[in-house]
From Swiss-Prot:
InterPro entries: HD, Homeobox_CS, Homeodomain-like_sf, Znf_C2H2_sf, Znf_C2H2_type, ZnF_E-box_Homeobox. The keyword Repeat applies. A zinc finger (C2H2-type) spans 24-46, 52-72, 481-503, 509-531, 537-560. It comes from Caenorhabditis elegans. Disruption phenotype: Worms exhibit a starved appearance, are unable to swallow food and die at the L1 larval stage. RNAi-mediated knockdown causes significant reduction in expression of mec-17. This is Zinc finger E-box-binding homeobox protein zag-1. Residues 165-179, 331-355 have a biased composition (Basic and acidic residues).
Length: 596
């Protein structure tokens, strides 16, 4: 029982009000807070200070609670991941599919292989691919169109980030018709333009600035810089190095420049221009529609039906055996008639000296679709496909650099160096690609891709699951400390140290009365109050006392507004007989009386 004089204050004004508890007042406005750190975060609203920043989306926050909520929800992952995904190119997908099917088929050892063979085979393959694209179905026998559409001028822009200026060229085109296969003379250009149409004979020049005038008639032509001139021996050395490694390091560039006695920048620009030329020559869309129709019309005369890749190779073999001599003669004739004038970065040329010739001759160089270029094509266009296969769990995609460090012996290679197969011995560097299970996964992955946008979105959802926030501790000067075992971030080092007990399972603070142990010291302090009966926290309205600060805070924040104050009650007859004292009880029977 509680005496009235001890339980009730002398006057009602002595009870601390809510305004008295909010002793931390904002100097800018009339708001007041119970805790100092609430005032600090409120002042940031006036000052505009936002000390917390997300490392993923770089969004800043003024309140630690908003920052913690943002980091826990990981909303910024979905916004950052689409930029990491390269969309599919339908032409590249079809090329990749056909290459994989060719690798899956048995090797035909009786088929000859020369520099011109790959060119002829790729022209047939391109014609078949374009025909399937127009029909919207799988590769089928090609038919001669009634009226081939005239190709439109098209400018292909090669984006080379390291090239400081633009390289331009003039391309001469001429159409020649042979008995077996009509071929078109198009010299792959290290330039910013292409010839508009195969029907236009003569010199057609389109530079990057949109001018179509001939360079010889312009009064602004000046001689090339002396550093841009390379003799035949220097170009031969550069071509040999390019065959071995089209992407040399800066140390290899310096070594090559020292070997041929030129500046490193000259070698670097030569490699960049040559790579651009290779990309342009290997790009399917760069083939004019007119040449596609011509190739398709010529292929229609062949009795072979192009239903499968094996039949396509048979058609190529038949064509080569019938027209090898005429094709070789026509290629030599076109090489003599074509003229490539490669200009310096300033767009200058000199009639007295021979400018830098970046064209690859067919005598001492490999064909356009050589094994090295095919490997580069697979590496450049198959990155997204490799990611799909890697996520599928097969793990059969190999690294080209790792394979190059382990040369394959001649007896271990599936195709010997002296074999006449159309697929050379470089296939041995990718033995696991020939796995039927892997190819089935590749086919399934390719069939699921309907458009480049769908590819990007599907890969985005898969890669977002793999992304994780940095688990390394942040710098102390940033004021944030992250746990190295989870995604939580703390503003103090001591808070991080206490949090690590959650992962380690240690309970260093033990009670000396019972056997309980706690991870944090303040938990032990509050636990000891259960043994001692101490309740230092009391509600000033209902006079209820609490031993734990958390219970007291919850009561003050949620129940203080409607908890019933204590009032006098008439004493029961037994109380009057015993002592005659008047008791105080809460107005609500649900609220327990205050404990002392």
């Amino acid at each position: 029982m509680v005496d009235i004089a001890e339980a009730m204050p002398t006057t009602a004004s002595s009870l601390p009000s809510d305004e008295a508890l909010r002793k931390f007042k904002c100097p800018e406005c009339t708001k007041a807070f119970k805790f100092k750190h609430h005032l600090k975060e409120h002042i940031r609203i006036h000052s505009g200070e936002k000390p917390f920043e997300c490392q993923q989306c770089h969004k800043r926050f003024s309140h630690s609670g908003s920052y913690s909520s943002h980091m826990s929800s990981k909303k910024c992952v979905q916004q950052a991941s689409p930029s990491m995904v390269t969309p599919f190119n339908p032409y590249q997908l079809m090329m990749y599919r056909n290459i994989m099917l060719q690798l899956q088929t048995p090797q035909v050892s009786f088929l000859p292989s020369t520099a011109a063979n790959n060119m002829d085979y790729m022209s047939l393959l391109q014609a078949n691919l374009f025909q399937s694209l127009e029909n919207g179905t799988s590769p089928t026998p090609t038919q001669e169109p009634s009226a081939p559409a005239s190709p439109e001028p098209k400018i292909e822009v090669v984006d080379e980030p390291e090239v400081s200026s633009e390289v331009k060229t003039e391309v001469k085109t001429e159409v020649k018709t042979e008995d077996s296969v009509p071929e078109e003379s198009i010299t792959p250009a290290v330039s910013m333009s292409l010839s508009p149409a195969p029907e236009q004979n003569g010199n057609e020049s389109m530079n990057n600035g949109g001018s179509g005038s001939d360079g010889k008639s312009s009064p602004d032509w000046r001689p090339l810089r002396s550093r841009s001139f390379l003799n035949d021996s220097q170009v031969a050395v550069l071509q040999n190095h390019f065959k071995r490694n089209p992407f040399p390091s800066k140390y290899e560039l310096s070594a090559v420049a020292e070997q041929i006695g030129v500046n490193k920048r000259v070698v670097q620009v030569w490699f960049q221009n040559t790579r651009a030329k290779e990309r342009r020559s290997n790009r399917l869309p760069s083939m004019p529609r007119g040449s596609v129709a011509s190739a398709a019309a010529a292929a229609a005369t062949s009795p072979t039906v192009w239903q499968t890749p094996v039949q396509l190779m048979a058609a190529w073999a038949s064509q080569f055996s019938n027209g090898n001599n005429s094709l070789t003669a026509s290629q030599d004739e076109r090489n003599n008639e074509n003229t490539d004038e490669v200009m310096d970065h300033d767009g200058l040329k000199d009639g007295k000296e021979t400018p830098l010739d970046l064209t690859l001759s067919t005598d001492d160089t490999e064909p356009e679709w050589s094994p090295e270029k095919l490997i580069g094509f697979l590496d450049q266009t198959g990155g997204v496909i490799q990611e799909l296969l890697r996520q599928a769990g097969n793990g059969f995609v190999t690294n080209q650099e790792d394979e190059e460090e382990k040369p394959i012996k001649a007896e271990e290679s599936p195709v010997s160096s002296g074999s006449s197969s159309i697929w050379p011995s470089f296939i041995g560097q990718y033995p696991s690609i020939l796995d039927s299970a892997s190819l089935s996964v590749l086919e399934k992955a390719l069939d699921q891709q309907k458009s480049s946008e769908d590819d990007a979105s599907s890969l985005c959802s898969n890669e977002s699951k793999l992304l994780k926030f940095p688990t390394t501790p942040l710098k102390e000067e940033e004021g944030l400390f992250s746990c190295d075992q989870c995604d939580k971030v703390f503003g103090k080092q001591s808070s991080l140290a206490r949090h690590k007990y959650e992962h380690s399972g240690q309970r260093p603070y033990k009670c000396d009365i019972c056997e309980k142990a706690f991870k944090h010291k303040h938990h032990l302090t509050e636990h000891k109050r259960l043994h001692s009966g101490e309740k230092p926290f009391q509600c000033d309205k209902c006079l209820k006392r609490f031993s734990h600060s958390g219970s007291y805070s919850q009561h003050m924040n949620h129940r203080y507004s409607y908890c019933k104050p204590y009032r006098e009650q008439p004493a029961s007859p037994s109380d009057v007989l015993n002592g005659g004292s008047v008791t105080v009880s809460p107005s609500s029977s649900n609220t327990p009386p205050p404990s002392t």
